Regions:
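Interfacial loop-to-helix junctions that mark the boundaries of transmembrane helices
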Residues: 1-4, 24-27, 55-59, 67-84, ...
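Juxtamembrane and boundary regions of transmembrane helices in multi-pass small-molecule transporters
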Residues: 4-7, 153-154, 158, 174-175, ...
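Hydrophobic mid-bilayer segments of alpha-helices in multi-pass membrane transport proteins
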Residues: 6-15, 26-62, 81-93, 244-254, ...
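Hydrophobic alpha-helical transmembrane segments
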Residues: 6-9, 34-35, 85, 120-125, ...
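Membrane-interfacial helix-loop connectors
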Residues: 40-51, 78-79, 130-167, 171, ...
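Transmembrane alpha-helix boundary signature
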Residues: 43-76, 92-109, 129-141, 328, ...
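Transmembrane helical segments that form the transport core of multi-pass membrane transport proteins
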Residues: 60, 79, 101, 108-110, ...
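Alpha-helical transmembrane segments
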Residues: 79-89, 195-213, 265-278, 352, ...
Length: 456
């Protein structure tokens, strides 16, 4: 391993450490990710020929065509990254449109009950389902806002909020559009929508149901329902009830339609998400036509042109930085060597490899972990490493569900931590072991299905 290769690895590891300790450094992880991107590729360009000879042995252009070749490599990686970024931007915008225009109002009505345990199960399954359709971050925000209207006791709400984290991560693991990591794997063609839903659905349910069974022992009695003011009920007044339902079904139904669109047209998933965004945008413009005409009413601030500014661009830039930095590691051969090393150490046991990756995803960000694995292991024509093979499906499950073990291990956990003021220590003491039990139970369930049911 050359000094230059070691330098690139040091830049990546240092950046990774700063991202993992964002809560301590108070430096936004997107800024660090962008610096990682630039730092890694700048070092790469100091002597790209050694890496071209290593990773592209068919290259014969010599020094004269070196810059052009490297530029093409970077553009190819950027193209792959852009498909994920456009998908995320489209999905985030769609959810923002539905939320801001009252599309989720019906959820609060569905959740109403006096029994604490009944509410827990409604929260668990609704969060699970919504997270499979939306992203787990948005689902968590929506569910916490609903919980605040239903549960007044903060101690009880922390238990419910913890279940929201677990259910959101479990629900996102089996859906090709439910979590950033599954989006990455699906977008890359490593898993299919039908395959991951069919084989990861039951383990995901198990990883949510078992923690819910344990958590319900912490809740007894009935809820004291808070009063809902007329002003709160009238928070969304621009659209009629029918129009709000139309916005919901166009948005959420459209997200469900994306995998179907991909299977019919064979176009990348981001094309389907842009189709849904275009249709939903057009529909809301038609609904707003004639409303607040000639005025500066507050409702016009909910039009898509205004809502676009609310999309979290720092998240998009974070993924750009991470994915492009990981692509640099792939181009210097580090990921291939690491993947071979893991196979040797664990003797090719994919359950152990992915299980450890899942535990690591609760400590550090799962996006670079999954991106790294995508670069470490080539897709095989058949076997465990083939499309929809054991390794890729387990990676989708472990990277998603594993993030529940620590409150900082997932985007859902971080946002709930901030909204409900749950401390790292409280979650680790009361919830982490419960999430771990569910995580292991899901892996065992997957092993049982693959070993015994598939053998019949």
């Amino acid at each position: 391993m050359t000094t230059l290769t070691i330098s690139i690895i040091v830049v990546f590891v240092l950046g990774y450490a700063l991202i993992a300790t964002e809560s301590l450094t108070k430096v936004n992880k997107a800024a660090i990710a962008l610096l990682m991107l630039v730092g890694c590729w700048t070092l790469y360009m100091m002597d790209p020929m050694q890496y071209l000879q290593l990773m592209h042995p068919d290259y014969t252009g010599g020094a004269a065509g070196m810059v052009e070749k490297v530029t093409g490599i970077i553009q190819e990686h950027l193209g792959d990254t852009a498909t994920t970024l456009f998908f995320l931007m489209g999905a985030m915008t769609i959810v923002e449109i539905v939320d801001q225009n009252g599309g989720f109002n019906w959820v609060r009505k569905v959740m109403k009950t006096k029994s604490k345990r009944a509410l827990l199960w409604r929260i668990a399954f609704l969060t699970f389902v919504l997270s499979a359709i939306l992203d787990n971050l948005t689902t968590s925000i929506v569910m916490i806002m609903i919980l605040r209207k239903l549960v007044t006791d903060h101690k009880d709400r922390m238990v419910y909020a913890s279940l929201v984290i677990i259910a959101a991560n479990s629900g996102g693991a089996f859906s090709p559009i439910g979590d950033v990591t599954t989006i990455m794997l699906w977008n890359k063609g490593l898993i299919t929508a039908a395959g991951v839903i069919a084989e990861i659905f039951i383990p995901s349910v198990v990883s949510m149901v078992i923690p819910a069974l344990i958590l319900q022992t912490m809740l007894k009695g009935e809820l004291v329902m808070p009063e809902v003011s007329a002003q709160q009920n009238a928070s969304v007044s621009d659209f009629t009830e029918g129009q709000r339902k139309a916005v919901f079904w166009l948005g959420v139904g459209g997200l469900i339609f994306v995998p179907i669109f991909k299977s019919i047209t064979h176009l990348p998933p981001f094309v389907g998400i842009l189709l849904v965004l275009g249709v939903l945008w057009t529909a809301t413009e038609v609904f707003y036509r004639g409303l607040h005409r000639g005025t500066d009413a507050e409702g016009t601030q909910k039009r898509v042109t205004k809502l676009l500014s609310r999309v979290d661009m720092s998240t998009i830039l974070f993924f750009l930085g991470i994915l492009m930095a990981v692509s640099c590691l792939a181009e210097i051969g580090v990921l291939t060597a690491l993947g071979q090393g893991l196979n040797v150490v664990f003797d090719g046991n994919h359950y152990l490899v992915t299980g450890i990756i899942g535990v690591l995803s609760s400590i550090v960000d799962n996006v670079p972990l999954v991106a790294g694995c995508m670069g470490m292991y080539p897709v095989a024509a058949a076997g465990d490493m083939a499309v929809d093979g054991i390794f890729w499906q387990l990676l989708a499950y472990c990277a998603g569900v594993g993030g529940s073990m620590l409150i900082i291990g997932s985007a859902a956990g971080v946002v709930v931590m901030g909204l409900e003021k749950i401390t790292f220590g409280w979650y680790m003491k009361h919830i982490s072991w419960i999430a771990f039990v569910g995580y292991i139970a899901g892996i065992v369930c997957y092993w049982f299905i693959r070993t015994f049911l598939y053998a019949i």
